[in-house]
Amino acid sequence: MTNGESRSNGERARESVTRGFCRGWSWLQVAASMALIASPSRAVADATTPPFHLLRYDDNYSYLAHRQTSDFTPWEDLKYIPLDRESPGGPFVSVGGEVRFQYIERWNDQFGRIPGAQGSLQQRYLWHADLVGSDQVRIFGQLISAWEQGRKPTSLPTDVDHLDVQQLFAELKSAPDAAAKGYLRIGRQEILLAGHQLLKIREGPDVRLSFNGARAHVAQGDFDSDLFAANVVQPRAGLFDDSWTDHSVTFAGLNLGWHPKLSGLANVRADAFVFDYRNRSVRYEQFAGTEHRQTYGLRASGRSGSWEFDYEGSLQSGTLGPLAIRAWGVAFFTSYHWDSEPTKPKLTLGLSSVTGDRNRSDREINTFNCLFARGDYFGDTSLLTGSNTLDLSLLTDRELVQRLHVSIQWDRLWRSETTDGLYAPPLIYVRSGLVSDSRDIGNQFTLTATLSVNRFVTVQLIGSAFVAGDFIKAGPTKTGTEGLTMRTQFKF
């Protein structure tokens, strides 16, 4: 047997063991979820316990310290495990997890580069434990296992990670009676900043975005600030092989926030931020090489009566090899709520403009980098990121019946500059601007139905269709793309 064959057999054996481990865990979690759902005390728990957060380290079950453990529901037994039952209010462990299955069907994916129908099954398993040592010290850890079957020609790196550490950090908090509240987190962590368009956690794909580094947060009165510096975790398909020291992509930033209480306005927030981004290998239409980019931005959001707004604008500078970066992007979203109606409908009008490169022969590049924006920037087909696009969008959503939420979104897309091409998430150059002078990219339609069975189970159906415009039709692959996603998620 050759060394190559031996390694191949070893890899298959490890993969088999890991798959068996994950399947066992998945069935255990599903069974646990079903048991919790069937528990006769669930109605009480649903009414008195907090919802699960998108970032699970934000879940806080310290309030259970003031109740008798003998009165706990089966679910609460997992959420508060005191290390010393003789000392209520002392150190405790809280555990939880998630199982997510999603079937994705695509027709003529990537503008027809992959013709016909293609289906894939994705599975994601997350397990976490939160060790709370005191009011000021804790350690949070989370494992991830992500699998995909059926994707052709191959799975994306953000959809497969057989078993690895998603998060593992230590947190030091300020004293409970301190005037300024804050914390310092050091380790692998997910980062989300107050609704920013340029920093999301990549929830759509199987593997969420995480960073190796440090984050400091301070809040006092109407002001808060965040300072962070980290390298971006690059997911790999194997076992515990996501590097802790890979600095090929780094990200640092400072965000200053102000959230005053103003008469006639609710949920008002204003942010000023600066981000520093480095990528050792990136490709744009004009040039490929090492990128060092700074982003300076302002954001404002809030609500007045039935009206709601969320506006953000950014300037970018820096270098891409020998080229100077000069780019900008703005996004405006204005919503109107009909809260008195039984279905509580909401209508949102959006307009975003993101620059592309204006001149291939000069010493500048004007393509805006959307950094870590949502992968489904223009719908669930995830065909494009915002770079070099002008987007007019209309979104309507409502609760048809209790727990069933439906939304319909339309995006009309043009190129900002005819001298630049198009980019797929996260920033992959997919189409040259040379194929046509047309700005017309096309229309994207998305229908989303979300059924919240209870606090543990969510079922979602997403249908999307991209209708190709003149620029797409002029290319080597020139069709629209349709997609259907069926997603079931269990959390505990």
Please describe what each predicted stretch is.
Residues G97, Q123-L131, Q167-L172, A214-V218, ...:
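Residues on the lipid-exposed face of transmembrane beta-strands in outer-membrane beta-barrel proteins
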Residues Q102-R106, Q136-R138, Q142, A146-E148, ...:
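Structural signature of outer-membrane beta-barrel domains
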Residues E105-Q123, L131-K181, Q197-I201, G238, ...:
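Surface-exposed loop and membrane-interface regions of Gram-negative outer-membrane beta-barrel proteins
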Residues Y61-Y63, T479-F492:
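Outer-membrane beta-barrel "beta-signal"
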Residues A178-L184, Q197-S361, T419, V435-S436, ...:
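Signature for the C-terminal beta-barrel architecture of outer-membrane proteins
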Residues T2-G4, C22-L28, L36-A117, H128, ...:
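N-terminal periplasmic/intermembrane-space "pro-region" immediately following the signal or transit peptide
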Residues S87-G89, L131-D135, S174-A178, R208, ...:
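Outer-membrane beta-barrel strand-turn architecture
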Residues T49-F72, E285-Q286, E312-G313, L323-V435:
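Extracellular/periplasmic loop regions
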